[in-house]
Amino acid sequence: AINAKYIHSNLAVYCLKAYAEKNMPQDVNVQIELAEYTINQNRDEILKDIYRRQAEMICFSCYIWNLDYVESMIRDVKKVMKDVIIWAGGPEVSYDSRETLGRLPELTGVMKGEGEKTFAKLCKVYGKSSETSELSLEQIDGITFRCPDGTICERPWRVPMDLSEVPFVYHDMKKFENKIIYYETSRGCPFSCSYCLSSVDKTLRFRDTGIVKRELKFFTDS
């Protein structure tokens, strides 16, 4: 995640990690690390930290405030880590995934829309296990990806998930000290503002009220 300011945090990447870890078969060999930076950081400093981690797959979260920065970073990462698998997700790449892949030959694929279930499936593909040995990218909804022959393959959008299935991510508040906390009680929007990508998703969903009350109490008690 490359945030706009130091005080910001990226709720999306925390949700993806939490959901994937909760739903991962025991014999899938995947270790998920989060890395948050800001658009104000030195680019070489970020590139150095990414390289130091030596990840086999890197996923970037793309928004209107960081898209140019992220695209440039993707190009740089691929120069120094030629074999790394790179995926992108977020609202700024979801609705023009084919164009994004055409613009960025360094990308392996794009996750479209909400990413919890999609990211978990990708982890299972790349971390093969006895349960998922037959799973392939061609079977995963919610992605557009580059096939081995260079063609671009687009899968259908994923059916919106039950928001109550997303794990609560704020168990350790120390890592969010002096930062803004983002909490999600709903997804989708009933309005049609022309300037906002949220208007594209007409499926308005809410997190279970009982769960919301318990989680908000956690914040007030902390």
Regions found by a protein language model. Give the residues of each.
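Signal peptide-proximal N-terminal region
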Residues: 20-30
